[in-house]
Each structure stands twice: as structure tokens, then as C-alpha cells.
């Protein structure tokens, strides 16, 4: 954790996911006109509407009263089913391209898979009735994936999804014309040129002026903890040491580490704490990637 006044309202959290797969199973192809896009996984609800923009706006102590619905509801069992499905060699080779449903929901997850698309929002599986076209298009409900497959492979892919007890529905088709079309209740509610989407509607240019770094304002000469620099200038080494220890950024992270199980999957090579008494912080992360034989 990094402690700084700028993170009082919103924390900065950074995570990473790594995986490995045999090269023969990783297919990277273009989406061709006529290809079918299948939505599989969890159903779509109102949770997550506006989450992408909500994470970038100013929040206060009253935000929870109006922004609670922006937080997606997780569905771990369905996520596990998707993982099992994608680990099957015969399934991964059918997928030409795929995308996860992060920020923007259907409009982005499917909208990024090809230049020309026609999406039928009425086919999107719903958690409950009453969702309008906008909600179906932007909901960021989790545990969903969009995959592009050849028309001849649609039934085969749907069969594999059924074997994993996953809902899978063809919801879009790749078109020749570079336009994103979203249909709802038989009518287009979005019909935009790809060129417009790629440029945000305008040709953009910018001029940049970079100042020559100043020796007097050298960032690397500044102390992260100002009190340390002040004490050192006074020649008070002990005071500088105490000032540094008083900063939260040098405190032990053991309490945070203990909130997570580092032994899950039996893949950890070096645990977060090691040494004779298991109290010495490990300065790196080393783990085995889970692969099938």
C-alpha cells in the first residue's frame, strides 16, 4: 500500500493476472463479414451501469447513496465455468477473437471486435425484465465474455458451453460496412460510423511544450518524507531516522499480506515472508504458472 493525502478519497489499486497456454491453442485472426459473436457467461443486469465513468469522477461521503449501482456484482461460480471452458483445447481453437466485459459493457466488449457490427440487444440474456436498450448496451455486469467464431462453428461452440453449464447466445454478426449498429425491439438505437468512433468525432492534434529540467527543481533531489530532509540538513541523523520510521510508507505490510492466502493453487515459489522465522519480507514475487499437462 502507498499512503498519500491524494489517496484519501479513492485508493489506487493495481493488480495483474498472468496465464500460460500452449502456442498451438492461441489463435489470433481477424473478424470476417458473416462471423458470429457469441455472448457467454452471466446474465446482464443494471449493476455496473456507469461504472467506467464513475471511477473517474469526484466522489464524496454521500456518493454511496447514488453510485452504489455502479459497482458490479461478482459471480465466481460462472467465472470458474468460463475458465474451465477456455482451458479446453478444442474450444480455444474455435475462437478467432474474444473480449471481456469490462468498462462499457456490450457497446465496448462487442464493439471492439470488428469494424462493422450489428448487435441484437433483445438476444442479450437478462437477470430480470425491464431493462431498456441503453442499460443493455452499457451494463458492466461481470463474468461475461464475447467470442467471435466462424458461422460453421457456432453450434459446436454452443455445445461445448452447454457441457460446462454456461449460457451462450449469438447476439451479433460482423458486417461488411464499417458501422456499429445496436438494435433494440426491432429498431436501431445506435448507428455510428467506425471512423467517427475511432476519432471521437474529430481530428485531433496537440502542441506540446516541454521545459528543460531545472537543477533547482530536481524532483530526484527531494525527499519523499520532507521531515527527513529537514533533519539531515540540521545534522540530526537520529531525528531523520525517527522521522522516516514515523511515515506509514515504511511500516510493515504484514497485516495487509495476511488478508490474502498466498498458498492457493500451490503455485507460490517464494512466500511473501521467509527466513528462519518467516518474518523477513521477500523482495520479489515468484510463482509457477498453472498449466495443464
Language-model segments: residues:
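Glycine/proline-enriched, intrinsically flexible loops and inter-domain linkers
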Residues: 1-293
